[in-house]
C-alpha cells in the first residue's frame, strides 16, 4: 500500500475531504474513512454510506461527551478492542434521523456549544464514540485517530468514521484499500504514522521534581519526569553545561544488573562507566523504564531460563513471543527537547539507539564508545549483541 504524509492528510481534511486511516496489522488491520466534523458536509456522510458501507460513527473528545451527558452504551464493555460507544443519538430537529443530511445535522450538533443534552433523542442513528485521553498515544484506534486529526486541523475534537467494506461484504484490506484510494482519489495514512508524527512534534513529558543527587560517582542534578500518555516515571541526571553537543547516555533500566550487579549482562558496568564519564566531562544520563529491552522483569527472567537451556538473548525473546528489541526512544527524545537539545554526542555501542533518536529529530554529532570488561558469565551475551544485534563492541 502507498501511504501519504500526515501533513497531506491534514490538508485534505481541512478541505472537507475524507481520508483513509489504516490501523496496525496486529489489530483490526482495516481501513476507515475519516472526516472532521467541522469541515464535512452532507456529501461526506452520503459517500461513507454509499462507498464505505460500514457503521457510521462519530468519535468525540471525552469533554464533549460529558458536556452533553452521553452515557456509555454498555457499562460492562466487553468489546475486544475496548471501543467506547455511547448511546446512539438523533438531533431533535431531525425526522427519522437516518438521511445523510440528518446524520450530518446530528454530528454538527455535537460540536455546537449551544447544544444541550436535551437536544438529542436517544437512541438514534448516529453512534458517538469517546476517544481515550491523549489519543493515539494511549490507544491505537480509529476513534482516537479521528479526534487527533481533528485537533491537528485546528477544528473541534470530533469526526465521523466508517469502515470500508468490499462489494461482497468482506472487510477491505491491503490491495483492496489501495484500489479504493486510487478509485476515489483519497489520501491514506496509518495510525502508526500518526503516532510517530505526534511524538515528533509534541512535547508530552512533564517535569515533576528536581533535586541535588550526591552519588559514589559524583554530584549530579536529578530530574523526575512523567508522560501524558502512560504511568511511566523517568529520571535524568545532569552535570554541567548542556548547551553545545552535550554527552548523553540513554540507559535502559536493568534491575538485575544495575541494582544486584548481575554478571549475566554488561548493564550495571555500563551505567557506572557512564556516570563516571558524565561526572568528568558533563552531560546527561536518561534512565528509561525498559527492563529486558522492553519485555519487563519477569519475562526477562523467563528469557534467562531459556538461555540456561541453550538459547541466546535474541532467540530467547523470540521464543517467548517478543521481538528481539521492543524499545522506543521517543521519551528520551522528548526529554532532550525539554532541555532544548537537538544535537548530542551519544554514549552507546548500539546503532538502533542512533536510529531511534534520529527518527524523533535528534542529531547524533558523535558516538562515544562505551566498552566495559567482559565477565566469565556474559561472554556469550556480548557475542550475541555484536554478531546478531550489530553492537559496535
Curated annotation (Swiss-Prot):
Co-factor binding comment: Binds 2 divalent metal cations per subunit. Magnesium or manganese. Binds 1 zinc ion per subunit.
Protein name: Riboflavin biosynthesis protein RibBA
Domain of life: Bacteria
UniProt cross-references to Pfam families, sorted A to Z: DHBP_synthase, GTP_cyclohydro2
Known pathway: Cofactor biosynthesis; riboflavin biosynthesis; 2-hydroxy-3-oxobutyl phosphate from D-ribulose 5-phosphate: step 1/1; Cofactor biosynthesis; riboflavin biosynthesis; 5-amino-6-(D-ribitylamino)uracil from GTP: step 1/4
Swiss-Prot/TrEMBL cofactor(s): Mg(2+); Mn(2+); Zn(2+)
Binding locations of D-ribulose 5-phosphate: 27-28, 32, 139-143, 163
Main function: Catalyzes the conversion of D-ribulose 5-phosphate to formate and 3,4-dihydroxy-2-butanone 4-phosphate. Catalyzes the conversion of GTP to 2,5-diamino-6-ribosylamino-4(3H)-pyrimidinone 5'-phosphate (DARP), formate and pyrophosphate.
Keywords in alphabetical order: GTP-binding, Hydrolase, Lyase, Magnesium, Manganese, Metal-binding, Multifunctional enzyme, Nucleotide-binding, Riboflavin biosynthesis, Zinc
Similarity remark: In the N-terminal section; belongs to the DHBP synthase family. In the C-terminal section; belongs to the GTP cyclohydrolase II family.
Region ranges (GTP cyclohydrolase II): 201-393
Signal peptide residues on this chain, from the entry's feature table: none
Positions with a binding annotation for Zn(2+): 254, 265, 267
GO cellular component: cytosol
InterPro entries associated with the record: DHBP_synth_RibB-like_a/b_dom, DHBP_synthase_RibB, GTP_cyclohydro_II, RibA, RibA-like_sf, Riboflavin_synth_RibBA
One example GO MF annotation: magnesium ion binding
Reaction(s) catalysed (UniProt annotation): D-ribulose 5-phosphate = (2S)-2-hydroxy-3-oxobutyl phosphate + formate + H(+); GTP + 4 H2O = 2,5-diamino-6-hydroxy-4-(5-phosphoribosylamino)-pyrimidine + formate + 2 phosphate + 3 H(+)
EC number(s) given by UniProt: 4.1.99.12, 3.5.4.25
Residues that, per the record, bind GTP: 249-253, 270, 291-293, 313, 348, 353
Single Gene Ontology BP annotation: riboflavin biosynthetic process
Amino acid at each position: 500500500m502507498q501511504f501519504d504524509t500526515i501533513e497531506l492528510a491534514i490538508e485534505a481534511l481541512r478541505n472537507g475531504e475524507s481520508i483513509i486511516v489504516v490501523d496496525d496489522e496486529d489489530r483490526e488491520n482495516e481501513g476507515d474513512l475519516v472526516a472532521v466534523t467541522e469541515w464535512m458536509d452532507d456529501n461526506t456522510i452520503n459517500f461513507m454510506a454509499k462507498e464505505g458501507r460500514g457503521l457510521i460513527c462519530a468519535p468525540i473528545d471525552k469533554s464533549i461527551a460529558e458536556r452533553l451527558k452521553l452515557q456509555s452504551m454498555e457499562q460492562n464493555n466487553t468489546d475486544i478492542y475496548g471501543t467506547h460507544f455511547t448511546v446512539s443519538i438523533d438531533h431533535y430537529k431531525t425526522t427519522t434521523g437516518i438521511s445523510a443530511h440528518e446524520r450530518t445535522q446530528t454530528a454538527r450538533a455535537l460540536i455546537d456549544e449551544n447544544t444541550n443534552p436535551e437536544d438529542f433523542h436517544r437512541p438514534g442513528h448516529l453512534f458517538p464514540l469517546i476517544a481515550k485521553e491523549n489519543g493515539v498515544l494511549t490507544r491505537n484506534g480509529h476513534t482516537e485517530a479521528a479526534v487527533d486529526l481533528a485537533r491537528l486541523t485546528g477544528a473541534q475534537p470530533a469526526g465521523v468514521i466508517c469502515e470500508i467494506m468490499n462489494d461482497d461484504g468482506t472487510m477491505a484490506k491491503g490491495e483492496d484499500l489501495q484500489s479504493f484510494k486510487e478509485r476515489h482519489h483519497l489520501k491514506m495514512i496509518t495510525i502508526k504514522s500518526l503516532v510517530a508524527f505526534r511524538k515528533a512534534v509534541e512535547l508530552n513529558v512533564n517535569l515533576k521534581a528536581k533535586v541535588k543527587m550526591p552519588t559514589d560517582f559524583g554530584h549530579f542534578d536529578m530530574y523526575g519526569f512523567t508522560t501524558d500518555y502512560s504511568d511511566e516515571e523517568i529520571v535524568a541526571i545532569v552535570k554541567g553545561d548542556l548547551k553545545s553537543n552535550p554527552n548523553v547516555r540513554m540507559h535502559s533500566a536493568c534491575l538485575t544488573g544495575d541494582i544486584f550487579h548481575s554478571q549475566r549482562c554488561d548493564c550495571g558496568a555500563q551505567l557506572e562507566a557512564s556516570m563516571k564519564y558524565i561526572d568528568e566531562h558533563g552531560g546527561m544520563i536518561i534512565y528509561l523504564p525498559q527492563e529486558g529491552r522492553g519485555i519487563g522483569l519477569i519475562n526477562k527472567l523467563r528469557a534467562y531460563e531459556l538461555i540456561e537451556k541453550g538459547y541466546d538473548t535474541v532467540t530467547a525473546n523470540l521464543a517467548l513471543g517478543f521481538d528481539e528489541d521492543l524499545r522506543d526512544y521517543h521519551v528520551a527524545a522528548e526529554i532532550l527537547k525539554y532541555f532544548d537539545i537537538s544535537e548530542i554526542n551519544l554514549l552507546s555501542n548500539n546503532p538502533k539507539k542512533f536510529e531511534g533518536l534520529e527518527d524523533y529529530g535528534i542529531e547524533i554529532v558523535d558516538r562515544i564508545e562505551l566498552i566495559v570488561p567482559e565477565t566469565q558469565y556474559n561472554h556469550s551475551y556480548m557475542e550475541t549483541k555484536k554478531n546478531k544485534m550489530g553492537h559496535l563492541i
